[in-house]
């Protein structure tokens, strides 16, 4: 989901820098053979279809909604993820910034909705970001703490164009806190990393984590995963 927000923040920043001031509505659609979130499958390593609608203002403000199918086991209560987000993106002294709030909504039976505050800065081809748990409806287990700031995700991205419109990206992120263990069945502290290439909406990513035999076997979150996808953005 973070990649969707980064794209929207970039659009808001582009509008703010444009000499032609105009608000912008857009829609997006994507399909892939796996839904990966912070190195972990959200679709039991099966295909996912997603889409959303976004608004970006020339003031730097943006907001949007996004949804995808999800599953964590063959018989679990999760079937969809529906996100709502809003933020503000801008640039100062050649450094871009993005601040916002993201709410993750799941099936009512799951009772695991949660929200995060996020922020990032961009310096040249690098982006440094931090997501912080803000609130959740999930119940804490013994010894767990789901309070504000008790789960964090820090990441660094590097992106560049290598010619002929081919985009190359590298990512590394680190999660810390009890919430990931409760939600995804993996240890609270872990690192994920990936490398990706993309062109004209098509993308290919190799991703993995430093986990070792963690979580349900069906999720294989300690294995290297190959993700192929296609995305389409439409101006409304």
Residue ranges and their predicted role:
Residues 2-8, 13-236:
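Outer-membrane beta-barrel proteins
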């Amino acid at each position: 989901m973070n990649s969707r927000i980064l794209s929207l923040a970039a659009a808001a920043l582009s509008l703010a820098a444009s000499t032609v001031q105009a608000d912008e509505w857009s829609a997006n659609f994507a399909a892939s053979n796996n839904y990966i979130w912070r190195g972990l499958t959200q679709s039991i390593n099966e295909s996912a279809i997603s889409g959303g609608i976004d608004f970006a203002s020339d003031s730097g403000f943006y907001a949007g909604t996004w949804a995808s199918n999800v599953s964590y086991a063959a018989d679990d209560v999760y079937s969809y993820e529906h996100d709502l987000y809003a933020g503000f993106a801008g640039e100062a002294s050649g450094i871009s910034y993005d601040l916002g709030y993201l709410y993750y909504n799941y099936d009512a039976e799951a009772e695991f909705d949660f929200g995060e505050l996020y922020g990032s800065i961009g310096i040249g081809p690098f982006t440094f970001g931090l997501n912080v748990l803000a609130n959740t409806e999930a119940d804490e287990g013994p010894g767990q703490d789901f309070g504000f700031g008790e789960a964090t995700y820090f990441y660094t991205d590097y992106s560049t164009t290598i010619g002929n419109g081919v985009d190359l990206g590298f990512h590394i992120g680190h999660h810390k806190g009890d919430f990931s263990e409760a939600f995804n069945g993996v240890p609270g502290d872990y690192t994920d990393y990936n490398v990706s290439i993309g062109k004209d909406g098509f993308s290919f990513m190799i991703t993995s984590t430093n986990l070792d035999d963690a979580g349900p076997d069906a999720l294989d979150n300690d294995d290297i995963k190959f993700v192929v996808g296609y995305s389409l953005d439409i101006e409304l």
